[in-house]
């Protein structure tokens, strides 16, 4: 049972080669561009969502921070598309892998921190010691603030991994219960199947919300350092 339960989180291989690279490259192919296609409802909706997301993310930033607009919009589209594709049956979700989420979180976090130290080093150092701190607490507070800064990318990655993994496990368990009850009690099967449908709708919302939260936190880190 445990092996079957966690089998969907094992990175698949094709001819002995990891298929994760192909899976990661697949989501951008689902986003059409108006350069080659005539504008239709899909492209219009896509452009509207991109503009809305860009406006929400970039309102708080100055001119230097807005140079990240393309990266942040690309990030939220990539994570959202990857999460949604992972909800398909017999598919693999790369965002359930902590290693991949760390590979996204660490460079983005490091980029914002480096930008802060390069452009506003005094303000960046001031975050480690808030104004008015009592003298005896200064050494400990500097250590605490340093640790809180260093765990930011880990918090980003763990939050995304935990939420997506928990949803997939719950869907797997309820789906297995639906199949098991189908030969025992039909009314109970219908009730469990209804719960599964509602949970699937909830997981679609979670997939989109987690993409937004991940990108929003990166945007906030950028705002603090520009």
Curated annotation (Swiss-Prot):
Molecular function GO terms recorded: proton channel activity
GO cellular component: mitochondrial inner membrane; mitochondrion; proton-transporting ATP synthase complex
Disulfide bond positions: none
Annotated keywords: ATP synthesis, Cardiomyopathy, CF(0), Disease variant, Hydrogen ion transport, Ion transport, Leber hereditary optic neuropathy, Leigh syndrome, Membrane, Mitochondrion, Mitochondrion inner membrane, Neuropathy, Primary mitochondrial disease, Retinitis pigmentosa, Transmembrane, Transmembrane helix, Transport
Membrane topology: Multi-pass membrane protein
Pfam families linked: ATP-synt_A
Segments crossing the lipid bilayer: 6-26, 68-88, 97-117, 138-158, 164-184, 189-209
Effect of residue 217 to P: In LS and MIBSN
Biological processes per GO annotation: proton motive force-driven ATP synthesis; proton motive force-driven mitochondrial ATP synthesis; proton transmembrane transport; response to hyperoxia
Annotated compartments: Mitochondrion inner membrane
Gene3D superfamilies in UniProt: ATP synthase, F0 complex, subunit A
Impact noted for substituting residue 192 to T: In LHON; possible rate primary mutation
Keyword Ion transport: yes
SUPFAM superfamilies named in the record: F1F0 ATP synthase subunit A
Disease implication from the record: Neuropathy, ataxia, and retinitis pigmentosa: A syndrome characterized by variable combination of developmental delay, psychomotor retardation, hearing loss, optic atrophy and retinitis pigmentosa, dementia, seizures, ataxia, proximal neurogenic muscle weakness, and sensory neuropathy.
UniProt cross-references to NCBIfam families, sorted A to Z: ATP_synt_6_or_A
Protein family according to the UniProt entry: Belongs to the ATPase A chain family.
Protein name: ATP synthase F(0) complex subunit a
Species, as recorded: Homo sapiens
Gene symbol of the encoding locus: MT-ATP6
